[in-house]
Amino acid sequence: MAQGNIKVMGAQNNQVVEQYMTQAKAFVYAACEDFGIALVEAQACGTPVIAYGGGGALETVIDIRQDQDQGTGIFFFPQTHQALAETVETFSRFQHQIRPESCRNQAAKFTPKVFETSYLAFLEQCYQDFTKTVR
């Protein structure tokens, strides 16, 4: 099934996942989810992402072809194995432009603390808007 450069490992603890993720050339994600925490976790390890360009990936990954300075990965379209294979080839031409620190900086935008701060600011704004209409 898997070739010599692919290792199917099954469930692993966080330490093993982090070790492999940090050493990976890229994290491939072909699913379409609303958020997809695995994309953020890969970037937190400094690992570029090759992802289907739909769903939450569009918010969490920056395509290197769109932003040469802050790119954190590359998208493929449509969601087919042919498009994925072509994008893996394309990634090989761009991979050295993607900096681990850019990946980590992008992941830092999705920490629980950032979410909490944003959510509280949103609630405060809603409250302020509400109190203006009540008076």
PLM ranges: what are they?
Residues 48-51, 58-61:
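Short hydrophobic beta-strand element within catalytic cores of glycosyltransferases
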Residues 1-15:
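Nucleotide-activated donor-binding/catalytic signature segment of Leloir-type glycosyltransferases, i.e.
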Residues 22-34, 47:
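Acidic donor-binding loop of glycosyltransferase active sites
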Residues 34-37, 43, 53:
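Short glycine/acidic-rich beta->alpha loop that forms part of the nucleotide-sugar donor binding site
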Residues 63-81, 90-96:
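Conserved acidic donor-binding segment of nucleotide-sugar-dependent glycosyltransferases
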Residues 18, 40-44, 58-59:
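Short alpha-helical segment that forms part of, or immediately flanks, the ligand-binding pocket
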Residues 79, 96-132:
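A charged, aromatic-enriched C-terminal amphipathic alpha-helix characteristic of glycosyltransferases
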Residues 19-24, 119:
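Short alpha-helical donor nucleotide-sugar binding micro-motif in glycosyltransferases
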